[in-house]
């Protein structure tokens, strides 16, 4: 018997010093992360972050496994310049396809100042005081053939209380979203096809990537009513469906869709439907063509639920939340390059050239944007930190907008830390 074992050194304790820029907005953070606290596999992070919206001092702790049990525990606390954020969760998840049961709960207390944007500029501000709670349990017959089915149920609270804020730089509260308090029991279903493939140099560099192909579907339905303490009667629903395939060693594709919203007062409210498709063609071990198409359709969106495109979510050559509306489409063409360059055995180096094109339709409280199709081109560097156990990739991009107003910078410089290439 011949056995080959490959290992990779990971720095569990590391400083976290980051600077980012997208959509013409800077952000920075400093702190440290420990991925193996006390040698027990627990994760601890402390730090400070700052961006245009808020300054934050935060602490987070996560125990992915308590003792020899499969229970996960996590807690987050953040003291922000505009409020606070507290999260607490305990869960025994479906940790494998053959896992038979799950249970857990989570709590949320989040207060923050939110902004609305038009053409990349802040036009409105308000305070969002959010409370959330969810308790759930689930059962599964396990993996039968190549399919796993899971049945879940629980109860949830989703509450948003909105209030006006004092003006900052002359911009305060003009329009205030409507308060919402939804308390409801719910039931859920999930189907997973056991069809995984292992790839490398797809969304990471030099790491094995488990890609789920085949079918994956989930749905959840709940009913809020005054008898439960809600401020309205509403059906709350959400779901997702995806299917992928790899017909040969050089091509793969994945199509996914999601939807969420409410049905109240005889019509839909806060409804958002998304379809996302990607295609990857690998020419060799060092270059891949990546194509992605995404569409979003909103219906009676809540005021605190804006739909926008900009430098922060796909249109890399444009300011933050530049185009706003009720429906959007985005196409990305990207040629990815992977190299063997491994400086100081710290970072794997790659690159990309890209073109983005997007459009937003529909109305806003200030009227339609009517910006038409917005396009940009650019190139960038990718750095994958091999000493981190989190699989993060540093993006350094330069993008040039081909459309838009004369007030837009002709070069957008973007730095971000992402979970994929």
Show which residues each predicted segment covers.
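Outer-membrane beta-barrel translocator domains and adjoining extracellular loop/strand segments
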Residues: 30, 56-61, 85-91, 103-106, ...
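Periplasmic polypeptide-binding modules associated with outer-membrane biogenesis and secretion
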Residues: 1-21, 25, 31-33, 47-49, ...
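Transmembrane beta-barrel wall of Gram-negative outer-membrane proteins
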Residues: 62-172
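Feature captures outer-membrane beta-barrel proteins of Gram-negative bacteria and organelles
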Residues: 28-37, 55-68, 86-97, 103-105, ...
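C-terminal transmembrane beta-barrel domains of outer membrane proteins
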Residues: 216-421
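Outer-envelope beta-barrel architecture signal
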Residues: 11-15, 26-28, 40-42, 55-57, ...
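Structural signature of outer-membrane beta-barrel domains
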Residues: 22, 51-53, 80-82, 95, ...
């Amino acid at each position: 018997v011949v056995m080959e074992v490959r290992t990779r050194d990971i720095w569990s304790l590391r400083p976290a010093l980051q600077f980012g820029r997208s959509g013409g907005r800077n952000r920075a953070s400093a702190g440290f992360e420990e991925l193996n606290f006390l040698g027990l596999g627990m994760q601890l992070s402390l730090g400070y972050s700052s961006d245009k919206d808020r300054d934050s001092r935060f602490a987070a702790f996560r125990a992915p496994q308590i003792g020899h049990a499969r229970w996960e525990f996590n807690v987050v606390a953040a003291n922000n310049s505009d409020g606070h954020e507290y999260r607490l969760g305990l869960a025994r998840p479906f940790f494998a396809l053959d896992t038979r049961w799950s249970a857990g709960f989570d709590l949320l207390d989040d207060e923050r100042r939110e902004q609305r944007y038009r053409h990349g500029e802040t036009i409105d501000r308000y305070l969002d005081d959010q409370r959330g709670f969810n308790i759930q349990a689930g059962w599964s017959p396990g993996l039968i053939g190549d399919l796993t089915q899971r049945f879940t149920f629980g109860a949830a609270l989703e509450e948003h209380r909105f209030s006006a804020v004092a003006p900052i730089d002359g911009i305060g509260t003009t329009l205030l979203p409507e308060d919402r308090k939804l308390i409801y029991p719910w039931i859920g279903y999930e189907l997973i096809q056991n069809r995984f493939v292992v790839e490398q140099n797809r969304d990471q560099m030099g790491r094995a990537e488990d890609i789920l192909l085949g079918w994956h579907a989930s749905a959840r339905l709940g009913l809020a009513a005054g008898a439960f303490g809600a401020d309205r009667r509403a059906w709350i629903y959400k779901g997702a469906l995806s299917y992928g395939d790899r017909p040969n060693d050089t091509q793969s594709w994945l199509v996914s869709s999601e939807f969420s919203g409410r049905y109240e007062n005889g019509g839909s409210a806060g409804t958002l439907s998304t379809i996302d498709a990607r295609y990857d063609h690998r020419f060799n071990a060092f270059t891949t063509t990546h194509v992605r198409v995404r569409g979003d359709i909103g219906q009676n969106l809540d005021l605190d639920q804006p739909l926008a495109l900009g430098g922060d979510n796909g249109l890399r050559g444009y300011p933050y939340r530049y185009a706003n509306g009720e429906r959007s489409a985005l196409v990305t063409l990207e040629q990815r390059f992977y190299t063997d360059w491994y400086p100081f055995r710290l970072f794997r180096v790659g690159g990309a050239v890209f073109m983005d094109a997007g459009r937003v339709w529909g109305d806003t409280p200030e009227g339609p944007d009517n910006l038409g199709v917005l396009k940009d081109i650019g190139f960038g560097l990718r750095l994958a930190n091999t000493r981190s156990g989190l699989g993060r990739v540093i993006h350094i991009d330069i993008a040039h907008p081909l459309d838009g107003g004369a007030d837009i910078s002709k070069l957008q410089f973007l730095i971000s830390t992402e979970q994929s290439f």
